[in-house]
Amino acid sequence: PFCDNTTEADLQTQNFNNQTTPLLISNKGRYIWCDGPFRFQLRDGKIRIESARGTIEHATAGNTLKEAYLAASGKYLPPTGILPPELFFSKPQYNTWIELIYNQNQEDILKYARSIIDNGFPTGILMIDDNWQKDYGNLNFRPDKFPNPKAMVDELHAMGFKVMLWVSPFVSPDSEEFRYLKTKGYLVKRKGSDQPAILDWWNGSSACYDLSNPDAYNHLRSTLKKMQQDYHIDGFKFDAGDPERYPEKEVDVFDRQSYDTEQTYLWAKLGLEFPYNEFRACWKLGGQPLVQRLGDKKYSWDGVASLVPSMIAAGLLGYSYACPDMIGGGEYSSFQGIDASGFDQTLIVRSCQIHSMMPMMQFSVAPWRILNKENLETCIKYAKWHEQLGDYILSQAKNASITGEPIVRHMDYAFPNQGFEECRDQYMLGDKYLVAPIMSSGNTRTVKLPKGKWKDDLGKVYKGGKTYTLDVPLSRLPWFVEVK
């Protein structure tokens, strides 16, 4: 969950825009766990760790990364036997964010959905992103942008899409909802005051639900359920909930034990009430049927290069049902000012290829708007390849729901003691596919194969235990299966 070369972190206030779990694991079979957030530091080959909120536990479960992970996840993050709806895994997902940003509106959302079908992409889940609502905390569509939202959702359903809506725990401070929630005591308060705290976040300054108050929690849940009934919405993209928004030094909450990470936990726990869910911030809920999206990646090669190591980390924290952000990136400011003809088409295609052999893939920037015919056909090919892999990916998701095993696996997890400890650019998709994507602008890459005999995507057989350099034209995603 940490940035490259992280030497220290405080999980009470830092989540690096991603999911976190109070767990450190070693490929030597050891792990460290704490029920509460901890601060740790790596220096001179030693780990210094401290926590004010829990007992720090450490154990040796064996001699490998797999043994350490399975022991820790089985004890602290046990799988439930339940997984998110199959559609998350079997079809591509689509999100209106990069195309519309804050101009979410009925006409353009329907146009985006029709373009998905017209360009030959499979239908799946469609997420309507931020600024569809009248105010934060108000779950009514803006009438100036959505003249008939129920009809829009029904039309999207008729096209073959499931529909999810962006929501957050924030409440606009000059809204009718704010006044009501303030009266009821449902909002996080300023430290030492009975007045709601106004918290800074990426869209401004807002009040925020205090989900440690059971009545506030139930009110928000009921409001979301009612919206589902009124507009036929299938589920929600639960954004925000980051622990740094609830600092103990600055706010008061209903349950005085529920600051920072506990509010993150309660926000994510709310998602268990809605099978169609997606989270970016999450705390200590590995093994649960919650869909996790990696934090927003920039439209850049650095963003592409971060996908594999970040997905591996998510799996090792118990978050198997994960999506590697949006194809090409989800950090909208990195897309601004770029003409449709000015995009790095190679970057988009390589990002799409990586997504295609992940548990989930999600489009946002419209490939048909920014790619030439040949590269568009390549993206369609890999969207359909993900669809073809659907049954296999779903089988691995079902396995994760029973055993807790990651779907995206570190090479050292699958092949211990073969020199893969530092490998961050290839991975196993379940127990079958070794995936070695291109994550830079070049057309060659080096692949290290485990012992045994391996066959690649072109049918060529290789002797394992060796390193190979492959030619990888833009139309190709290298993957291997072991020949028994």
What residue ranges belong to the model's regions?
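Catalytic and substrate-binding clefts that recognize carbohydrates or anionic sugar/phosphate headgroups
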Residues: 1-88, 106-118, 413-415, 469-483
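Residue-level detector of short, conserved catalytic/binding motifs and their immediate flanks
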Residues: 19-23, 28-30, 92, 275, ...
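N-terminal small/glycine-rich loop or linker at the start of catalytic domains
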Residues: 84-99, 195-208
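Carbohydrate-binding surfaces of carbohydrate-active enzymes
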Residues: 115, 120, 142, 155-162, ...
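Short, glycine-/Ser/Thr-/acidic-enriched flexible segments
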Residues: 30, 37-39, 99-100, 133, ...
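Aromatic- and carboxylate-enriched substrate-binding clefts and catalytic-loop regions
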Residues: 1, 122-379, 383, 412-415, ...
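Generic recognition of flexible, low-complexity loop/linker segments
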Residues: 9-12, 19-21, 81-83, 114-116, ...
